[in-house]
């Protein structure tokens, strides 16, 4: 019934967006590519590539979603991301030294990544 149709619509909505982007009917923001890339690297244990990409992914998320919603939670998450930028720059620079991953790096990546993912999910849900 209606519940089944609603669940199917919720499941396929991201696919519709992907199809529109591929078909040239819609444009994706850089953060929509970068944030999932960081997640894929982190989940696969590629901590250094994730650490190198996270700062620019978070910066893109802030810039590209700043004015997209008037929502207190959205603004609080963007403030959290913005305040994380100095630490993400340090992380990026440390990852560039070539010394490999360090203890706790995965958790350092996970926290701001989860906030950025939440920002993108919220924007997707509230702008449709």
Language-model features and meaning:
Residues 38-39:
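Conserved small-residue packing positions in alpha-helical repeats and bundles
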Residues 31-34:
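Accessory, solvent-exposed terminal regions and/or long lumenal/extracellular loops of proteins
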Residues 49-50, 57:
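Solenoid-repeat scaffolds in large eukaryotic assemblies
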Residues 73-128:
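Long, charged low-complexity segments
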Residues 42-43, 49:
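Hydrophobic/aromatic side-chain positions at a characteristic register within alpha-helices
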Residues 60-61, 99:
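Alpha-helical junction/boundary sensor with strong preference for TPR arrays
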Residues 1-28:
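Helix-loop junctions and short alpha-helical segments
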């Amino acid at each position: 019934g209606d519940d089944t149709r609603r669940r199917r619509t919720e499941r396929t909505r991201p696919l519709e967006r992907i199809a529109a982007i591929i078909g040239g009917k819609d444009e994706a923001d850089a953060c929509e590519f970068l944030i999932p890339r960081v997640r894929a690297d982190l989940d696969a244990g590629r901590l250094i590539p994730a650490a190198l990409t996270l700062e620019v992914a978070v910066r893109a998320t802030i810039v590209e979603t700043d004015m997209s919603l008037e929502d207190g939670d959205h603004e609080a998450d963007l403030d959290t991301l913005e305040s994380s930028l100095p630490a993400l720059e340090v992380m990026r620079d440390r990852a560039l030294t070539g010394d490999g991953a360090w203890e706790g790096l995965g958790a350092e990546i996970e926290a701001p990544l989860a906030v950025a993912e939440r920002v993108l999910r919220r924007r997707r849900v509230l702008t449709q």
